[in-house]
Amino acid sequence: MIHPIQFTLTNHDGTLLFCVIKNTIFAYKTNGEDGHLDLAGEWVDDYDSAELIKAKVEKEQQRRLAENAAKKLKTNEGEAIERPGNQRRVPLPGKDPKVPVPGPGAPPVYQYIRCLQLSHDEKMLVACTDSDKAAVFFRIELHKDNCLTLFKRQPFPKRPNAVTFADDDAKLLLADKFGDVYAVDSVGEPEKKDPEPILGHVSMLTDIALVTDTKKSYVITADRDEHIKISHYPQSFVIDKWLFGHKEFVSSLCVPEWQSSMLFSAGGDSFIATWDWQKGLLMSSFDYSTIVEPHLTDAHLPPARFLANDGSDRREASISKLLTFKDLPYLVAVPEMTKIVLLLQWDATSGELILSQTLALPLNVVSATVTSANHKLILSLDNREQPGKNFVKIFTLENGKFEEEQAASSSVDEAIVRNLSERPEVQTTVDDIYPLYHVSQLRKRGEHYS
């Protein structure tokens, strides 16, 4: 069976659809006439992580050799001797370092492609890889047989988790799992030394956004510790304000283009928060718990050791993604590991989000993306139970409701099966499917506070 799509991204008019399957990015282009999709490009992350480990081992070997040499003393005859108590075992110079190999029972290592982001002019695509903790940059050149041209690969000290481009696309802002944010040039050669962070949190960063207020730019960052921080940019050492109100982790931030002074945020709490980030005010919160509760399963239960054992049902819901359209006052909210998507409408009069529609899907939703030009919502599904079909569902706003474009959905399914059914690198079994749901793992429990 073909592996489910882990991540989707589309350009503003929906003519390009990027799909991540295992460790490969596929770019599909529609001909614009009958909705037929053609494979326009692809890129596979074949980086050998063992080489990265070997390089780190070699670096450590050289450090220990230098440290050992510095600890040597000399006798009266000028001969070097080891200082007592420093007889550490160090590798001999010139000897190949021994690269550690996972032993029996070690968890599998996945070559994740963790996120995708288009530049504002849609001429560049950036992806984050787990294999070497890098951001990889592509030029989108549709006149070529393969439209994805890799031109830069920038490694980072820790795994990237979220990215966004500066307004002029000259810089990429990247948030990592260590709590640091980096700003690197989008063009030019990769920095040979580890880049220096421009700001940081004391917890894993989960999302990042760049906003503008009266010609001043700010970077908004969210973390696993329910914090949302607003910092000046590029003077990011200056903190403008904090937004307090969440009790659990924040997994997704969304600044709507139709009201750039607002910010939506959600994660492990039972609500979606609406902020006036410029004033630092919590405008309202939308409680989605009663809507999502009927769609939760035993997969949403906490680990057995954290159950109350009192017969209570403690299924925990999380929002994995928030999205908005360019000129439509709707918010798309994706509850993780469920078969529904919430469509919320912003009521400017009451200053609140109102449930407009609940989309019911045949399978769990994995990822979501929207087009800004024609109000399309594209969802990828966990189709392990229905291999070969239901890779995506495409919805369009018609008469105030989002309706499925069945022909468009089928066109994507047909293109994937046509191009990938004979490709062994994207084949899998049910037991070997990459983990598709990551957000709920951000929830902190007793073991994280000890």
Curated annotation (Swiss-Prot):
Region (Disordered): 69-103
InterPro entries: Trm82, WD40/YVTN_repeat-like_dom_sf, WD40_repeat_dom_sf
Record flagged with keyword Repeat: yes
Description of how the protein assembles with itself and partners: Forms a heterodimer with the catalytic subunit TRM8.
Record keywords, A-Z: Nucleus, Repeat, tRNA processing, WD repeat
The UniProt record lists the keyword Cell membrane: no
Identification of the protein by name: tRNA (guanine-N(7)-)-methyltransferase non-catalytic subunit TRM82
Family, per entry: Belongs to the WD repeat TRM82 family.
